[in-house]
Amino acid sequence: MTHMTKTLLEMSELRSVPCNDAIDLAPMIEEVLTDLAPLAEQKGITLVSKGDAQTIGSDTLIYRLLFNLVENAIRYSAPNSTVQINACAEGDRVLLRVRDQGPGIPEQYQTSIFQPFFRVDKSRSRAYGGVGLGLALVWEIAALHGGSIEVEKSSERGTTMLVTLPTRALGSLK
């Protein structure tokens, strides 16, 4: 089964996944960074995590959300740079920030990148790989958990993606 087919199946089955696990984000972030360390090492990228927070949701889906964001950050970052992920609680929300040192996302595309198959630049997809579903999946997972994702900052020196999740379960979650 191709990577694209697997991702499409994941997206179609999201609503059936129970979302009531208590999740400590620091250990999950460390697991994601460990799993992506070989990819980062190929480019000489340092992975850094800071902070901790707790949320309620699907540990499988939150892992996928974090994995996709960090994997994108590694792919688009310059060699020998740093990818940083921060987690913190702010009131009744959890804020997750993934910062890379890549080419940035032009302002006119900062909402379009969450649409399935959208590409800022076709040459980027050839250079960096992927099928254009990773950020769409992240958007769906965040929304399913009562949260959101946005480009918080972006310039030619890198991008910071911000995911906001509730710290407690929503009545609509399974």
What are these regions (language model features)?
Residues 105-119:
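Short conserved segment of the HATPase_c
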Residues 80-92:
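Short beta-strand/loop element within the Bergerat-fold HATPase_c
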Residues 21-34:
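A conserved beta-strand-to-alpha-helix junction within the catalytic ATP-binding
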Residues 100:
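Acidic ATP/Mg2+-coordinating residue in the GHKL
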Residues 39-49:
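Short conserved segments within the C-terminal catalytic ATPase subdomain
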Residues 73-74:
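Short helix-loop "hinge" at the ATP-lid/N-box region of the Bergerat-fold HATPase_c
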